[in-house]
Design a protein with these regions (language model features):
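Surface-exposed, charged secondary-structure patches
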Residues: 20, 63-142
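Short, low-complexity N-terminal intrinsically disordered segments enriched in polar/charged residues
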Residues: 16-40, 44-70
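Short beta-strand edge/turn micro-motifs at domain boundaries
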Residues: 108-109, 120-124, 132-136, 144-180
């Protein structure tokens, strides 16, 4: 019986600690996934509703690109690992996001920049079920030091803090219909 309790305690301990993470700890861990290139873990930290919104936008862009079918297919294959928009629609939002990150940030100079970036969460401001985490990011880009203070929004979903899309990214998605692109 003691073995069962010990094993159960060991298995449940990470769940309890994840539920008790502060918004700052979540943002630190989120940026650590960028540093390490663990884009699956990054996607798992995102708000599911934000990922669904992103997927809708990406499918809309793929449908309305105005470029040749060959160019669209090449872009879809390179970015998402799919052959056409039907396959893109079939992807789970978290998988679409992970593949997009891997394509854009997973190699070359961006990979190098991200692996050396440092993030220090400074605090947060609560607004309803959302916390706006203020953090300082320091990195080297082409020999230049960049040091910026920014804000990352997180929302409590099912008892856990989940990362939201930044305001500028969400605004870009919302502007797509005005530009004639149906997300």
């Amino acid at each position: 019986m003691r073995w069962i309790l010990l094993v159960a305690g060991l298995l449940l301990a990470p769940m309890v600690s994840a539920a008790q993470e502060t918004p700052e700890q979540v943002v630190q861990r989120y940026f650590e996934t960028f540093r390490s290139g663990d884009f699956a873990a990054n996607a798992a930290m995102m708000d599911p509703a934000a990922l669904a919104e992103l997927k809708t936008a990406m499918v809309g862009v793929a449908d309305a690109t105005g470029v040749s079918a060959d160019e669209t297919q090449a872009h879809l294959r390179e970015t998402f690992g799919v052959q056409n928009t039907a396959e893109l629609r079939a992807l789970e939002p978290a998988v679409l996001y992970e593949r997009m990150l891997r394509s854009v940030l997973g190699q070359g100079e961006m990979r190098e920049v991200l692996s050396g970036a440092r993030v220090n969460a400074l605090g947060h401001v609560l607004e309803g079920d959302t916390a706006h985490v203020v953090y300082r990011m320091s990195m080297q880009v082409m020999g230049n030091s960049i040091d910026q203070v920014q804000v990352a929004p997180v929302r409590r979903v099912d008892g856990r803090w989940r990362v939201l899309l930044t305001g500028s990214f969400a605004a870009m998605i919302n502007a797509m219909p005005a530009a004639g692109i149906e997300p």
